[in-house]
Regions:
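Periplasmic N-terminal accessory/gating domains of Gram-negative outer-membrane beta-barrel systems
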Residues: 1-61, 78
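A beta-strand signature from Gram-negative outer-membrane beta-barrel systems
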Residues: 45-84, 88, 97-99
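Transmembrane beta-barrel wall of Gram-negative outer-membrane proteins
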Residues: 94-117, 133-172, 184-206, 244-250, ...
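Structural signature of Gram-negative outer-membrane beta-barrels, strongest in the C-terminal barrel
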Residues: 157, 165-167, 247-253, 257, ...
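Surface-exposed extracellular loop regions of Gram-negative outer-membrane beta-barrel proteins
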Residues: 216, 267, 315, 329, ...
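Outer membrane beta-barrel strand-and-loop segments of large Gram-negative receptors
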Residues: 235-239, 280-290, 366, 370, ...
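C-terminal beta-signal and adjacent terminal beta-strands/loops
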Residues: 487, 495-522, 537-543, 547-608
Length: 608
């Protein structure tokens, strides 16, 4: 979609309208979950076999959504098949999956479940072994993931319904810079929730939800500046909502929420057992009330107004009220709309490196700080031309206050971060265009986003405004599909995005351990001054696939052949620095890691 970009394969997060990737809320049945952070972009982060229905809000947020500045993605699980069992098996070079759904109690209770795993680490190892240049190798990161997703849907009676959802994910990555320098990352998540709905009549509904989420990550660096540690975040959540249709023109939605969150960080100890020692623990309670009113003024105009109140109780206590408003005008197949929304956020993300990684540390408000706030204004139009063509254009502006970052004197350990959390301000603005053509066997979609994002902190870059590492000026996506025959489908996807800013050191300091003589290799320590002082090259790539369907009465097959990064574009995912010596001179050369070069794949999907 326009206004949404990704930066590199090492970062699975999305950046919405100039915001950071930690400013997006992911929800299942309106209940927040932990983001799994699967990398590469080859495989979807969430399994569409279970989560095949989602709604994205990047402006005009309903009042029930708060605590994230940029966007909300609400996904609704597949209820399963209450009449008969069905399954799916996928076997491929990159990944495999086993999926099933069917009745637990026929016509009453059903389930859907999925288990996926990847083999990318084996492809990486083969690639690394095949390299000819052993003196200056460019190793491909070894990455793997597995996840399990499950849901249960039960119709308890004509008025009562219960659903349950669970998602567990496990990821591992080893990134080898040289024979002596490597990074090892591990992270996993768990999310689960239960929803009970009561519908006394056709005009009103009650929902009661309970859930929890947990994330854990651990990182180690070997052969460079010693660094490593782990962090954990878990939360307990509950909410009750009430919806009522007061008339054909007026609808009301209201609710109350509660969240308890705890954050634990630990440093890697120096002993041989490689233990994690506790560094800091933080927690908070969040209480929330909201009200939404939807009113159809007449045949053409509709109005949505609402408000969200939150009370945050942690190291600091904060009250916030977030108003929302949206007005739409529709005539025939043309829609013009304008909206305003205030959002607040209490969490920030401390980066482990100069680029975002899945092991970055979530951290709540420090004492004496205020929640980040965003005031967003946007207008847009939608125009449909029959069943053939649709066009969208939009413009937005975001004014952000009390956005968070961290002082630059933390580099090597997961120490207490509260004293180094800093506040600043920023803005984002942009234009969005989207064009979709759907004509018989041909489908094409193209969108373009022009945007600018700025941040300003007194403690960073001498108080000068700067482009953050998620400022992507130009972003283009072109998707083309052609149904060659009833059995054969061609898919292509080309993406382009402007290079993002990263932090390059101004120099290096050589350090050496003079107390131990078993290793005389010096350690190079980078010296940083300004942040985000270098712009990486533009990113672009082409993905293509050809799907062939065949089968009989009981078994259906789909054979997929394709390639990721067809023309082998070297899009940098990670930048590092390496010393190269010649003629008694040593130069510090910037290097980059490509997460995924050209990778062909073949997979066979079997449905029954």
């Amino acid at each position: 979609m326009p206004g949404i970009v990704t930066t590199n394969a090492l970062n699975s997060g999305i950046y919405v309208r100039g915001g950071n990737s930690n400013e997006n809320g992911f929800l299942i049945n309106n209940m927040p979950i932990a983001y799994p952070d699967h990398l590469t972009g080859i495989l979807s982060t969430f399994d569409p076999y279970i989560l095949n229905n989602s709604t994205l809000f990047k402006s005009g947020f309903p009042a029930r959504y708060n605590s994230f500045l940029s966007s909300y993605i609400n996904m609704r699980p597949e209820p399963g098949n209450k009449h008969e069992h069905e399954g799916e098996l996928t076997l491929g070079l990159v990944s495999s999956a086993l999926k099933a759904r069917g009745p637990i109690i026929k016509n009453h209770t059903s389930f859907a479940a999925s288990a996926r795993t990847s083999y990318l680490q084996h492809i990486s190892r083969l690639y690394n072994r095949s390299m000819d240049d052993k003196t200056n190798p460019n190793y491909m990161p070894e990455y793997s993931f597995s996840d399990i997703t499950a849901t249960i849907d039960s119709r308890l009676s004509d008025k009562w319904r219960m659903t349950a959802f669970g998602l567990f994910s496990l990821d591992h990555m080893k990134m080898k810079i040289s024979e002596h320098v490597q990074y090892i990352f591990d992270w996993h998540t768990f999310s689960g929730n239960v929803n009970v709905s009561y519908t006394p009549n056709a005009n009103e509904q009650w929902d009661f939800q309970f859930g929890g989420k947990n994330t854990y990550s651990e990182g180690d660096a070997f052969g460079s500046v010693p660094m490593g540690g782990g962090n954990r975040n878990y939360a307990l959540l509950g909410q009750a909502t009430y919806s009522r249709r007061l008339s054909d023109k007026l609808n009301l939605n209201s609710g109350a929420k509660f969240e308890y969150s705890r954050f634990e960080t630990a440093n890697k100890s120096d002993d041989s057992q490689n233990l994690l020692i506790k560094s800091s623990d933080k927690d908070f309670n969040l209480y929330e009330l909201y009200l939404d009113i939807n009113y159809q003024l007449n045949q053409n105009f509709s109005l949505n107004v609402g408000g969200n109140y939150q009370f945050y109780a942690g190291e600091t206590r904060e009250h916030s009220f977030s108003p929302r408003a949206k007005i739409s005008y529709t005539v025939n197949k043309f829609t013009l709309w304008a909206d305003y929304a205030k959002t607040v956020q209490y969490l920030s993300l401390y980066p482990y490196f100069t680029v975002k990684t899945p092991i970055d540390i979530w951290y709540p408000l420090a004492k004496g700080t205020q929640p980040a706030t965003c005031h967003q204004y946007s207008i847009g139009i939608n125009q449909e031309v029959g069943q053939l063509l649709s066009f969208y254009a939009g413009i937005f502006y975001k004014d952000m206050r009390n956005v968070k970052d961290f002082a630059s004197d933390i580099q090597t350990e997961y120490s207490a971060l509260s004293n180094r959390q800093i506040q600043g301000k920023g803005h984002a603005k942009g234009l969005e265009f989207d064009l979709t053509l759907n004509h018989h066997a041909l489908y094409m979609r193209a969108n373009y986003t022009l945007s600018e994002s700025k941040r300003k902190f007194a403690e960073i870059n001498n108080g000068k405004a700067f482009n953050p590492p998620y400022d992507v000026k130009h972003n283009v996506m072109i998707n083309f599909s052609y149904q060659i025959s009833p059995r054969l489908l061609l898919n292509t996807l080309w993406t382009f995005s402007s290079g993002v800013y990263t932090t390059f050191p101004k120099g290096m300091v050589i350090a050496q351990n003079i107390t131990e003589f078993n290793d005389d290799r010096p350690i190079l320590i980078p010296v940083y001054t300004d942040r985000y002082n270098y712009k990486l090259p533009n990113n672009h790539r082409l993905d293509a696939s050809l799907d062939y369907k065949f089968g009989g009465k009981n078994l259906l097959f789909k054979l997929s052949v394709g390639a990721y990064n067809v023309y082998n574009q070297s899009n940098p995912s990670f930048v590092y620095f390496q010393a190269e010596s010649a003629d008694n001179l040593t130069k510090i050369i910037p290097k980059s890691k490509v997460m995924l070069p050209f990778i062909p794949y073949v997979s066979l999907r079997i449905n029954w």
